[in-house]
């Protein structure tokens, strides 16, 4: 992975002038891409494949949280969602017992933050900002979530900086929840899959538990419209799955 020159970062790890300009350009590109994407019905949670994938992911995430003993800590946990969108996962954590005042969501798109504030409990904190610098967020977090954020970033040093910030804001016994795809989409030049090796590079000296999940969307979308049962059966065949759901912990 390409590493930025030493002058790109300040002594405390914050972006320097070179990185800041590069990150701003990449952030503008991402905003433009996702502003258009939000208009596509294929990404609606009411689309059958999206709905089934969401249900599968929710079940697997709850199992993972229980595996690491986090299910009993949700009520007191401070949770940060990086790239929170409309706040769907923060709402789920509230449903699972999290206290809204302990939850924070950030997103690059102001319209997503506006939507999140309109549909989520008012005690949840939402900020429209880049994840490359989280110094304005008070305190540390027990859980940091990211969902298809890293595959949306094409600038390697920006990915590294966000990973560093997520780790910096994570408590020593906390966990990062990772959900992203590992297979490139030849039809979409605006994203890039992230394989296990790159995840390890982004989070060195961490314990990483990844499981394959989510039936490949080009296959799953037409099947889900015909048969939910067939979709679920095929999603159990791991070579057909395109995403990783995982837990990342500090050593």
Listing of model-derived features with the role each one plays in the protein:
Residues 1-44:
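N-terminal, positively charged/glycine-rich alpha-helical extensions of SAM-dependent methyltransferases
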Residues 160-172:
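A short glycine-rich, Lys/Arg-flanked "PGG" loop and its adjoining helix->strand segment in the class I
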């Amino acid at each position: 992975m390409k590493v930025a020159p030493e002058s790109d970062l300040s002594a405390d790890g914050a972006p320097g002038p070179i990185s800041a300009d590069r990150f701003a350009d990449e952030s503008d590109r991402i905003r433009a891409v996702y502003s258009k994407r939000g208009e596509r019905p294929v990404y609606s949670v009411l689309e059958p494949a999206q709905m089934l994938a969401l249900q599968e992911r929710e079940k697997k995430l709850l199992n993972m949280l229980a595996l690491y003993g986090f299910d009993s800590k949700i009520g007191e946990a401070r949770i940060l969602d990086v790239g929170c969108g409309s706040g769907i996962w923060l709402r789920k954590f509230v449903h699972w017992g999290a206290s809204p005042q302990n939850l924070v969501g950030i997103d690059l798109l102001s319209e997503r933050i506006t939507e999140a504030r309109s549909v989520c409990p008012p005690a949840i904190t939402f900020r429209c900002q880049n994840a490359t610098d989280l110094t304005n967020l008070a305190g540390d977090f027990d859980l940091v979530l990211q969902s298809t954020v890293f595959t949306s970033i094409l600038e390697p040093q920006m990915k590294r900086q966000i990973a560093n910030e997520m780790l910096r804001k994570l408590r020593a016994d906390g966990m990062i929840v990772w959900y992203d795809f590992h297979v490139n989409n030849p039809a979409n030049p605006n994203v890039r899959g992230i394989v296990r090796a790159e995840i390890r590079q982004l989070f060195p000296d961490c314990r990483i538990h990844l499981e394959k999940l989510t039936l490949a969307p080009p296959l799953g979308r037409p099947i889900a419209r015909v048969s939910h049962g067939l979709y679920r059966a095929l999603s159990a065949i791991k070579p057909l799955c395109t995403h990783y759901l995982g837990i990342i912990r500090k050593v």
